[in-house]
Regions:
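A generic structural micro-environment signature
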Residues: 7, 52, 374, 382, ...
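Intrinsic-disorder/low-complexity coil detector
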Residues: 15, 24-27, 31, 683, ...
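Positively charged n-region of N-terminal signal peptides that target proteins for export
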Residues: 1-4
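Bacterial N-terminal signal peptides
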Residues: 6-16
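C-type cytochrome heme-c attachment and multiheme electron-transfer modules
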Residues: 20-533, 624-658, 748-750
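Membrane-embedded alpha-helical bundles that constitute the cytochrome b-like, heme-associated redox core
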Residues: 463-495, 502-750
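Generic low-polarity alpha-helical segments
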Residues: 14, 20, 74-79, 114-117, ...
Length: 750
């Protein structure tokens, strides 16, 4: 059985990769040249730059390329020739020493060319399997940056049909890469910037130009193609505002989030956490720790369980120059360098320091084999102590390396490839808008520290790591982030916490709640002592008209709905009464109802002059206020009659002051801040003007606490009538009990 599986895998690995260049009928025939410009008859003798430079401006291309040494060493042949190899043999040459037409398979780079360095690319005829070279000694220029860095595998096949052991594999009917399935090649996004076929860019520094119609001719472009490749993002082809009707506040989401936050949320390829080229495995490759691979002893990557990658969300400047939250995978890369000139020690020399005869040298085994089983594997490969690092450094010095040292870099690989179908896109709002948000994940930076040195953070201004890199319990490093630091200054509903407004609001609420509890308890105790005392005679008077009651109950129900949905938005994931999007929709609807009701009530009170009930009169105000305060502090406990209001007033001085603050300060404050929160989600310009929700949301939050406090106090004071339900009934029926010796309120409704 195992032999059969091996045969199948061998056939797969031998299958052709994604479609490559065919015979080019247009490209002129040419003579292969060596570095001196002389004709040669074999591929080994040929110099690509000299050969191609006979027609193309090789100097210009070398000065305008993203693939220059030492970062990469891509040649013309690797990128433009089928199979990354030009078939130069004597029998392929004509009498003039020129390559025959049928051997010229030169053209636009295809995905297979990119795969020779960057990652795993397979065509429709080859189920996905990881080749042996994936963990072998690194070839020159081969970085596996797509697969190791992003967990991306560029293939049109369904993931369920692969040979890999994927978690939840039976449900993975989507292709590995939807663009590969739709025959979209790498150059669709990464094209030459000065290509005349592209009209979506501009040259020069004129800021007011969105496109420059002045283009090179095709002939000029073929001589001087710019090899600084474009980084086209999703918005270059897709209009996200037309494809996310279900998403609330689409404009705000698209302004601050990269498309890949939801559409590349769980790549299924093996993504590296750490590439340690200071140590060498028995297979001759660097020691690699994977972030999403559960690997047992003896497992290969084809038999180990691969989980969906949970990326780190950070702020990153995208190709359009806008800083957005984007998913990245942090990879710590360690290597040996020479302190003398700062140059990297070639991995071949590092391998010689570790290996002898295709296996670990006996001296290395003797020094690093902690369990004395005769081999080095697992944690034994780690140079995580000064003694281990010095042992290998001494062997490197013996091989001629001057002053070797361990250096680490932290690379942030943006997840921009391996995009799957929309059914695998993240649709759970709680993934970000909750206490356990992906925005504040603790992220492992390094499992251990080779040579004891931490990796250097990413260079450049494109990536912003928010948080603190701190030691982990396992001896490595983790990126720790709190709710306010991740990422940047974004305020995320349901996740971000307004510490100072919560503290102030809760303390005020707690003080009022404690006060009414104590006050109510004393009232109850004193009422029991005088339970034999009858209530004084009273008459029913029609005090509250129909519209006043309708206005009051509409306001009350709207306020309750706003408090409940506000708590749901603020504490998403804790209450689980409804989804975040539903809570936001209901909250906004009741906010509109409350505002409309408030303006209609204002018109009513102005038109009927009932507004006078809310305006305190200076004459006798302090005396009346003191009388009502004395009653609440003492008289209510002994059954004394409620103090009379001033003639023509429905509200006592304490109520007038409270409603004056409520209707003229707190109510407008909540309307303005709530409207700004809504506007920030609709219009990006508003977000920029008010710094997002960073300041507006805490103020709105404090207002909500004060509204909740007023609600508790208001409900309690309802119970302070002749009976606990007397005031409540009056707001339902309109009739209120008035002591017989108490004159009828002049403002009573008829």
């Amino acid at each position: 059985m195992s032999r059969a599986i091996a045969v199948v895998i061998a056939v797969v690995l031998a299958s052709p990769v994604a479609a490559q260049q065919g015979v080019n009928p247009i490209h002129p025939v040419f003579a292969p040249l060596d570095a001196a410009g002389k004709k040669v008859r074999t591929a080994q003798e040929m110099n690509p730059e000299k050969t191609c430079g006979a027609c193309h401006d090789a100097a210009y291309i070398a000065a305008h390329t993203d693939h220059k040494a030492p970062r990469s060493a891509a040649t013309c042949i690797q990128c433009h020739v089928s199979g990354a190899r030009l078939d130069v043999r004597p029998e392929r040459l004509d009498a003039e020493g020129k390559l025959r037409r049928d051997a010229i398979r030169i053209g636009t780079p295809r995905a297979a060319n990119c795969a020779t360095c960057h990652g795993l690319v397979l065509d429709v005829g080859a189920p996905v399997v990881l080749p042996d070279s994936f963990e072998a000694a690194p070839a020159v220029g081969r970085t596996w940056s797509l697969t190791r860095g992003e967990g991306a595998i560029i293939a049109p096949q369904r993931m369920v049909d692969s040979f890999l052991d994927l978690e939840g594999k039976e449900s993975l009917a989507a292709p590995w890469d939807v663009h590969a399935a739709k025959l979209v090649d790498c150059v669709a996004c990464h094209y030459a910037r000065n290509s005349p076929a592209r009209t979506d860019g501009k040259q020069g520094s004129l800021r007011y130009l969105t496109a420059d119609p002045r283009r090179q001719t095709q002939a000029e472009f073929l001589v001087r193609p710019d090899h600084r490749l474009a980084e086209q993002d999703c918005r270059g082809c897709h209009d996200p505002l037309k494809a996310h009707a279900f998403l609330p506040y689409r404009e705000r989401h698209m302004e601050v989030l990269s498309c890949t936050v939801c559409h590349a949320s769980g790549p299924m390829g093996p993504a590296a956490e750490m590439v340690d080229a200071t140590s060498v495995t028995a297979a001759g490759g660097p020691s690699v720790t994977y972030r999403n691979v559960d690997r047992r002893d003896g497992d290969t990557l084809n038999t180990a369980t691969i989980r969906p990658l949970r990326p780190l969300l950070i702020e990153r400047v995208e190709s359009d120059g806008v800083r957005r939250v984007a998913p990245v995978n942090l990879v710590s890369r360690y290597r040996w360098v020479s302190r003398t000139d700062g140059a990297d020690v070639p991995f071949e020399i590092v391998a010689r320091a570790w290996l002898e005869g295709g296996a670990h040298a006996p001296e290395v085994v003797n020094a690093l084999d902690a369990d004395r089983n005769g081999r080095i594997d697992g944690a034994e490969l780690r140079l995580d102590t000064p003694q281990k690092a010095e042992f290998i450094a001494a062997r490197l010095r013996a091989l001629g390396v001057e002053d070797p040292a361990v250096v680490g870099n932290l690379d942030a690989h943006p997840l921009a490839h391996g995009i799957s179908t929309r059914d695998r896109a993240l649709r759970d709002c709680n993934a970000c808008h909750s206490e356990d948000s992906r925005l504040s994940d603790e992220y492992v930076v390094a499992s251990y520290l080779p040579g004891g040195s931490p990796p250097r953070p990413p260079d450049g201004a494109r990536v912003a790591l928010a948080g603190t890199i701190a030691p982990s319990a396992a001896g490595g490093l983790v990126l720790q982030r709190d709710r306010e630091a991740a990422p940047g200054i974004l305020h995320v509903l349901g996740h971000s916490r307004q510490a100072w407004t919560n503290r102030i609001g809760f303390l005020v609420f707690l003080a009022v709640l404690l006060g009414v509890t104590v006050h109510g308890g004393l009232r109850y105790a004193m009422r029991r002592k005088r339970s034999h005392v009858a209530h004084p005679a009273a008459e029913k008077e029609y005090v509250f008209g129909r519209y006043e009651r309708l206005w009051h109950w509409t306001m009350a129900l709207s306020g309750i709905a706003l408090i409940v949905t506000g708590l749901e938005v603020h504490g998403t994931g804790k209450w689980a009464l409804m989804s975040l999007s539903t809570s936001v929709a209901i909250h906004n609807a009741f906010a509109v109802i409350l505002i409309v009701n408030g303006f209609l009530a204002l018109f009513y009170h102005l038109a009927t002059a009932a507004i006078r009930n809310f305006i305190p009169h200076p004459r006798g105000f302090l005396a009346s206020a003191l009388e009502h305060m004395t009653y609440q502090a003492r008289g209510i406990f002994y059954g004394e009659s409620h103090p009379r209001n001033a003639a023509g007033q429905k509200l006592n001085p304490l109520q007038q002051v409270t409603y004056l603050a409520l209707l003229n300060v707190l109510f407008p404050l909540q309307i303005v801040t709530g409207a700004l929160i809504w506007a920030v989600g609709k219009w990006p310009a508003v977000a920029s003007a008010v710094a997002g929700l960073h300041y507006v949301a805490p103020i709105h939050n404090l207002g909500a606490w004060l509204f909740l406090t007023f609600f508790v106090l208001h409900v309690y004071l309802v119970s302070t009538g002749r009976t606990p339900t007397d005031h409540l009934k009056s707001m339902i029926t309109g009739y209120q009990h008035v002591d017989a010796d108490e004159p009828e309120p002049e403002g009573a409704a008829r």
